[in-house]
Amino acid sequence: MTVSADFTPLLHKAALGRPLDSHEAETAFHAIMAGEVDPVQLAAFLTALKLRGETFAELTGAVQAVRHHMTVLPDVPAGAIDVCGTGGDGLKTLNVSTAVAFVLAGLGVPVAKHGNRALSSASGATDVLEVLGIPPTDDLELQGRRLREDGLVFLAAPQHHPAMRHAAPVRKALGFRTLFNLLGPLCNPAQVRHQLIGVFDGRWCEPVARALGALGSLSVWVVHGSTEEGGSDELTLAGPSQVSAWQDETLFSFRIEPDMAGLAAAPISAIRGGDAQTNAAALLALLDGAGGAYRDTVLLNAAAALHVAGRGDIVKAGVIDVPAFRRNVGMAADSIDRGLARAALEAARMSAHSIAPKDAGRS
């Protein structure tokens, strides 16, 4: 291993409890992504940041470094959106953002969904998509074709962030959330400028929205839901959700209640998930018209995503426009009830098998 000479003084600074500026954080994470940091040093660095509390500048610098090392998907349609969460909330729910992606695609919104295998849930996006017959691929040409022709592509994190492997063993050994848990949603390989992102801790809503705005995003919602079992990285029916939004170069925050969308409250246990097969079956049932809390949770998040994508403005001067919000819920419901979302899934499945992915068997 070639050890970075630039990293050690930054480790010392972090160990003293002093914050790094964005340039220093970018330098540190460049070294990490290049595999030039000793595992013991990396563990000490991440722990020091965690204990002191990571800052906005450190987040921004880390994002710039990770984006520099990622494999970018070129020629992405204007207006493409990502809907994803950080994971790490420990609630083990059904796959909400994956279902939202099909709902949006059914309405003609181009979706470049960034995802991974299960972290805190029983089944991550990649796990359930494989069961649905939509395996990941590292073929950029095929990914681009899926997005251009189907309006939907799923981008598995390992295929686009190979440099993350240098940090993976240390992150696993540490066993607690670090700054890395936030970086995936902020580093979409399609470089989308519209995003609905869920975070595991509400304190990150505003910094993440502000960071994405500073890095060129046009429209962003960063959300954190409340439940009877703790916070959620999605908008929930179980309680109020915190939102920080970046739009028109302005940052503002507000709360959303389920009844604003015309939806009934429900406990988080109503959307408890299982393994990949269980979650895939629930998603198919949802797209085939099944009702209940899972459908309503998907509608709530899809309505927000439609706003972020510019398909139905539901915020006026930083305040939720309730009738407009409910119209967006209606649009999302229409995608399901008219079979548009299910058709989007079938198109994605057909595209996945029109050319056999090079890495379909990779775990």
Swiss-Prot record:
Keywords: Amino-acid biosynthesis, Aromatic amino acid biosynthesis, Glycosyltransferase, Magnesium, Metal-binding, Transferase, Tryptophan biosynthesis. It holds the Pfam family Glycos_transf_3. InterPro entries: Anthranilate_Pribosyl_Tfrase (IPR005940), Glycosyl_Trfase_fam3 (IPR000312), Glycosyl_Trfase_fam3_N_dom (IPR017459), Glycosyl_Trfase_fam3_N_dom_sf (IPR036320), Nuc_phospho_transferase (IPR035902). One of its GO terms (molecular function) is magnesium ion binding. Binds 2 magnesium ions per monomer. SUPFAM superfamilies: Nucleoside phosphorylase/phosphoribosyltransferase catalytic domain (SSF52418), Nucleoside phosphorylase/phosphoribosyltransferase N-terminal domain (SSF47648). Mg(2+) 2 binds at residues 233-234. Anthranilate 1 binds at residues 85, 116. Its EC number is 2.4.2.18. It comes from the Bacteria. Anthranilate 2 binds at residue 171. Its cofactor is Mg(2+). Belongs to the anthranilate phosphoribosyltransferase family. PANTHER family: ANTHRANILATE PHOSPHORIBOSYLTRANSFERASE (PTHR43285:SF2). Catalyzes the transfer of the phosphoribosyl group of 5-phosphorylribose-1-pyrophosphate (PRPP) to anthranilate to yield N-(5'-phosphoribosyl)-anthranilate (PRA). This is Anthranilate phosphoribosyltransferase.
